[in-house]
């Protein structure tokens, strides 16, 4: 309220067709302005009539105002900020939102590396932040709105996600039990970051299923997930020599020179799943998109490993030859254990 007459002493606010009211005193400190909050009020539109009175009890002319009370119904339809990216940046995570110009900001809640839950407000003018979150841990964020003339901020429903694990580099670890290559599709293509090149075994070399390849990670890693990209160009997805069933193995010991499984631990058995469930040779757009995006798997036997081995047990087309384009491994890097003997 703003007022100029020093003789005003009190006032009354009416609403709900004068069924409800609130009396208030007008400050005598000469400030000429003050505010009054009516609470609680149910969500909705309101019309208000205000009377002021001087020290002799004479009323003013009625002043009429309108206003809106926001609440759960309004908050339930609030838009949430679009998350553009969550990326690993060295030992921290970079987060960026988009389409936030009409919003006040975002409240991000996450677990930091000390094990504490932190809440960070990110203003829409910034729309990005860097945090020391735990890889693989859950985060949530709400979007803060402040409608025009509102005295309070309103909060959207929370969006929940997980911070990604770190992608670990690796190379081929040469052993006599690694399946030979044909057609010039070398196993090094599995870790070159190029989805147009891959590894291809063949029946001509005498190789029969299962086929296997051994890898050394750049550093010991607590593995949590991996992704395999099958041959999905043109109409190759979910047919021919694309892997259908396979196992993943790990060890921290230097692999035996004969390439045997001694000292290795099976981390899990995995199977490629075609989204449509249609017979081999029949593809939907969703099948193709799924194959090209790569198939991700959680590793049930989580542990810290330096060496990995994949064994392909069955192909989609029932063929003995196997082909796929790329492998990616994700987890939490650990310090070196002293093993540094590469067989490249």
Regions found by a protein language model. Give the residues of each.
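Recognizes extended acidic, P/S/T-rich segments that occur
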Residues: 10-44, 107-136, 268-270
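An aromatic-rich alpha-helical recognition segment common to small helix-rich domains
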Residues: 1-2, 13, 38, 46-50, ...
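Beta-strand-rich modules
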Residues: 38-62, 129-161
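Aromatic, loop-rich ligand-recognition surfaces of beta-strand-rich domains
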Residues: 194-261, 291-344
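Extracellular carbohydrate recognition and processing domains
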Residues: 262-298
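Conserved aromatic anchor
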Residues: 1-7, 91-102, 228
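Low-complexity, Pro/Ser/Thr- and charge-rich linker/hinge segments at domain boundaries
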Residues: 70-89, 161-183, 334-344
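Hydrophobic core positions of the immunoglobulin-like beta-sandwich fold
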Residues: 38-39, 97, 130-131, 215, ...
């Amino acid at each position: 309220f703003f007022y100029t007459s020093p003789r005003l002493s009190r006032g009354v606010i009416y609403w709900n067709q004068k069924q409800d009211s609130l009396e208030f005193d007008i400050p005598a400190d000469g400030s000429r302005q003050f505010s009054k909050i009516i609470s609680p009020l149910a969500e909705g539109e309101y019309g208000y009539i205000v009377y002021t009175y001087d020290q002799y009890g004479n009323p003013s002319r009625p002043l009429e105002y309108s206003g809106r009370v926001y609440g759960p119904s309004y908050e339930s339809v609030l838009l949430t900020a679009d998350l553009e990216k969550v990326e690993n940046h060295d030992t921290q995570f970079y987060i960026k939102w988009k389409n936030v110009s009409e919003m006040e900001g975002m409240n991000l809640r996450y677990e930091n590396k000390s094990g504490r839950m932190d809440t960070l407000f990110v203003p829409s003018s910034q729309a990005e932040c860097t945090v020391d979150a735990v890889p693989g841990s859950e985060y949530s964020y709400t979007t803060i709105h402040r409608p025009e003339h509102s005295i309070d901020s309103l909060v959207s429903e929370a969006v929940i996600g997980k911070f990604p694990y770190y992608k670990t580099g690796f190379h081929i670890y040469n052993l006599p039990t690694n399946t030979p290559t044909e057609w010039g599709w070398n196993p090094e293509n599995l870790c070159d970051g190029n989805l147009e090149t891959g590894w291809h075994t063949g029946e001509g070399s005498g190789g029969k299923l299962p086929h296997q390849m051994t890898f050394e990670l750049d550093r010991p890693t607590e593995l949590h997930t991996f992704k395999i990209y099958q041959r999905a160009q043109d109409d190759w997805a979910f047919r021919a020599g694309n892997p259908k069933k396979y196992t993943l193995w790990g060890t921290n010991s230097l692999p035996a020179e004969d390439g045997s499984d001694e000292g290795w631990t099976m981390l899990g058995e995995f199977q490629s799943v075609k989204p449509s469930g249609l017979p081999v040779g029949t593809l939907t757009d969703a099948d193709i998109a799924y194959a090209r995006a790569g198939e991700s798997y959680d590793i049930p036997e989580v542990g810290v490993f330096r060496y990995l081995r994949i064994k392909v047990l069955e192909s989609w087309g029932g063929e003995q030859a196997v082909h796929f384009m790329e492998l990616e491994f994700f987890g939490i890097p650990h310090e070196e254990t002293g093993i540094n003997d590469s067989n490249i």
